[in-house]
């Protein structure tokens, strides 16, 4: 029964990750909250092996499932970028990946340097709740001010300067609950990208950022010390997050073409209020 409950927990977290990784609602924030609600850490590791590093690694591996969904959905774009890699070619793949690399640097540097401190100080429901509400208010004002006033409709036309500024905004997502997607989309609005282009640039930007974060987490643990059920849980969570993300990303792009982002902002505010109420009844610990 304990093993079954562990698998169910992994499925729940995989679903949450797949839904929230690319939406502007903060996947990390939702993971922290859900893990707290279902007491995920209980029974995940043998007492002799349990450390926070193992839990962090589990979270990162689950997130890789959602990241893989982007590779699958945008495989044609990725393939073309390497076929047209020469800098002199129209829609040069070299220029595209250079932009992604430049954009990834600010958050990558800060994330690697302050990874442990951020996990220690900010990975808790109270911090997430504050970030959800602050980010929602910022999203509402940014959409009103910048959405629709774009000069760049295609991510192949993003400049190095635009890419770097978007990358600087991504640093705000180091605060769990702020949302990497929300931060980068808002940054992209400010430098002139259309909403769809902003979302797609954010998707691709997740690839190197998540690879770096995952490497940082995994190098601190001995994966071979995990039990067979823990490997099964990791695999199940990875597959579930991959499948769910495949569905959500496609629907998200369709949504952005017709609907405003403030829908997600209102959800964030509502969730923040619910979390505050739950904390008052000691359901979660702030």
From Swiss-Prot:
The keyword Transmembrane applies. One of its GO terms (molecular function) is undecaprenyl-diphosphatase activity. It is found in: Cell membrane. It is a multi-pass membrane protein. It holds the Pfam family BacA. One of its GO terms (biological process) is regulation of cell shape. It is an enzyme of class 3 (hydrolase). The keyword Cell membrane applies. InterPro entries: UppP. The chain crosses the membrane at residues 5-25, 55-75, 92-112, 122-142, 185-205, 229-249, 264-284. GO terms for cellular component: plasma membrane. It catalyses: di-trans,octa-cis-undecaprenyl diphosphate + H2O = di-trans,octa-cis-undecaprenyl phosphate + phosphate + H(+). Its EC number is 3.6.1.27. Keywords: Antibiotic resistance, Cell membrane, Cell shape, Cell wall biogenesis/degradation, Hydrolase, Membrane, Peptidoglycan synthesis, Transmembrane, Transmembrane helix. PANTHER family: UNDECAPRENYL-DIPHOSPHATASE. Catalyzes the dephosphorylation of undecaprenyl diphosphate (UPP). Confers resistance to bacitracin. Bacitracin is thought to be involved in the inhibition of peptidoglycan synthesis by sequestering undecaprenyl diphosphate, thereby reducing the pool of lipid carrier available. Belongs to the UppP family. This is Undecaprenyl-diphosphatase.
């Amino acid at each position: 029964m304990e093993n079954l409950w562990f698998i169910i927990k992994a499925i729940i977290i995989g679903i949450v990750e797949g839904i929230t990784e690319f939406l502007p609602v903060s996947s990390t924030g939702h993971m922290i909250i859900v893990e707290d609600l279902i007491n995920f850490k209980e029974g995940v590791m043998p007492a002799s092996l349990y450390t926070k590093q193992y839990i962090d690694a589990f979270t990162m591996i689950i997130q890789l499932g959602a990241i893989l969904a982007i590779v699958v959905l945008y495989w044609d774009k990725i393939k073309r970028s390497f076929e047209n890699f020469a800098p002199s070619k129209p829609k040069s793949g070299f220029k595209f990946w250079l932009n992604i690399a430049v954009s990834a640097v600010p958050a990558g540097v800060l994330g690697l340097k302050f990874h442990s401190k951020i996990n220690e100080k900010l990975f808790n429901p109270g911090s997430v709740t504050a970030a959800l509400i602050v980010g929602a208010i910022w999203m509402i004002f940014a959409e009103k001010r910048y959405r629709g006033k774009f000069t760049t409709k295609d991510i192949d036309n993003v400049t190095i300067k635009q890419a770097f500024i978007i990358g600087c905004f991504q640093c705000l997502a180091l605060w769990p609950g702020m949302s990497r997607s929300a931060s980068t989309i808002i940054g992209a609005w400010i430098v002139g990208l259309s909403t769809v282009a902003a979302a797609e640039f954010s998707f691709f930007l997740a690839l190197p950022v998540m690879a770096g974060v995952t490497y940082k987490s995994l190098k601190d643990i001995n994966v071979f010390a995990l039990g067979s059920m823990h490997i099964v849980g990791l695999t199940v969570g990875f597959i579930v997050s991959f499948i769910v993300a495949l569905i959500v990303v496609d629907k998200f792009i369709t949504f952005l073409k017709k609907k405003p982002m403030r829908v997600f902002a209102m959800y964030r505010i509502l969730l923040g209020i619910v979390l505050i109420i739950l904390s008052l009844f000691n359901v979660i610990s702030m």
